[in-house]
């Protein structure tokens, strides 16, 4: 069964350490671009990840679309009210116009914030790839998030991270019937059981300091590899959309 990697918002108690599958706790604020999203779908609360790409825009997965979206920047322990945190509401959620919730195609969304985030040591932007830049099989990347620690396990209260290897496209083509190599990336580490899991949706796949992918979907048993939206295939849409709303909703 394929599932999106979002999660009902049931955070573990503060002080309870955990991991993304096969990962470890990140150094506090070592990923200052990370965003924690809370939103509602049909009255239920969910969480996703995201990342800051402009002072007033967060990039995430389109399947993280819901109502009353709140963005927390500058967090490490998400259950604490840390001084570094900036909580900002979303003015406008802009999923890709060709997003397909049945095949998971074009799973990308921009969130315009109601005000610009203040740039600090704990809050900053991450670079996006160049147009049509491709990651290659064998390349080491990483993901981070506050998602579920494993099958039937709680979500993390502290930011977790894990190193992943970009896999050959054939692995995801065989594993997922709707995998699209042109707009998606296959990543994980089947031999070591490392990957993103529930609640990590929308977070970045980071390769050499550049956000190359967005956590999209995988199998519900926590096995790897998983599918990531290929950001380089959507650069023109990202740039065009942010230009369109450049002077709207920024403090």
Curated annotation (Swiss-Prot):
Localization in the cell: Secreted; Cytoplasmic granule
Q: Which CDD domains match?
A: Tryp_SPc
Residues in the active site? 63 (charge relay system), 107 (charge relay system), 201 (charge relay system)
Q: Which UniProt keywords apply?
A: Disulfide bond, Glycoprotein, Hydrolase, Protease, Secreted, Serine protease, Signal, Zymogen
Residues making up the signal peptide according to the UniProt record: 1-17
Please name every pair of cysteines joined by a disulfide bond in this record: 48-64, 141-207, 172-186
Residue spans crossing the bilayer: none
Note the SUPFAM superfamilies from the entry.
Answer: Trypsin-like serine proteases
Q: Which residues form the propeptide?
A: 18-19
Residue intervals of the Peptidase S1 domain: 20-243
A GO cellular component annotation here is:
intracellular membrane-bounded organelle
Q: Which InterPro entries does its entry note?
A: Peptidase_S1_PA, Peptidase_S1_PA_chymotrypsin, Peptidase_S1A, Trypsin_dom, TRYPSIN_HIS, TRYPSIN_SER
Could you name the domain of life of the organism this protein comes from? Eukaryota
One biological process term in Gene Ontology: proteolysis
Q: Which residues are glycosylated?
A: 70
- State any single GO MF term: serine-type endopeptidase activity
The EC code for this enzyme is 3.4.21.-
Q: Which family does it belong to?
A: Belongs to the peptidase S1 family. Granzyme subfamily.
Q: What is this protein called?
A: Mast cell protease 3
């Amino acid at each position: 069964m394929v599932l999106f990697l979002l999660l009902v918002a049931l955070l573990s108690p503060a002080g309870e350490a955990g991991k993304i599958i096969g990962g470890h706790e990140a150094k506090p604020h070592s990923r200052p671009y990370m965003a924690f999203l809370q939103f509602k779908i049909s009255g239920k609360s969910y969480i996703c990840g995201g990342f800051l790409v402009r002072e007033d825009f967060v990039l995430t997965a389109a399947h993280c679309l819901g109502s009353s979206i709140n963005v927390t920047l500058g967090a490490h322990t998400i259950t604490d009210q840390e001084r570094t945190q900036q909580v900002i509401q979303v003015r406008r959620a802009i999923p890709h116009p060709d997003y397909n919730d049945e095949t998971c195609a074009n799973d990308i969304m921009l969130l315009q914030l109601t005000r610009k985030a203040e740039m600090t040591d704990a809050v900053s932007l991450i670079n996006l790839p160049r147009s049509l830049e491709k990651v290659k099989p064998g390349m080491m990347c990483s993901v981070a998030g506050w998602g579920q620690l494993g099958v039937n396990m709680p979500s993390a209260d502290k930011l977790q991270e894990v190193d992943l290897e970009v896999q050959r496209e054939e692995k995801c083509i065989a594993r997922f019937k709707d995998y699209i190599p042109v707009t998606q990336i296959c990543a994980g580490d089947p031999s070591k059981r490392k990957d993103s899991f529930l609640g990590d949706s929308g977070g970045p796949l980071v390769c050499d300091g550049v956000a190359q992918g967005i956590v999209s979907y995988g199998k519900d048993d926590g096995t790897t590899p998983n599918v990531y939206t290929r950001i380089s295939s959507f650069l023109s849409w990202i740039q065009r959309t942010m230009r369109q709303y450049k002077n709207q909703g920024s403090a």
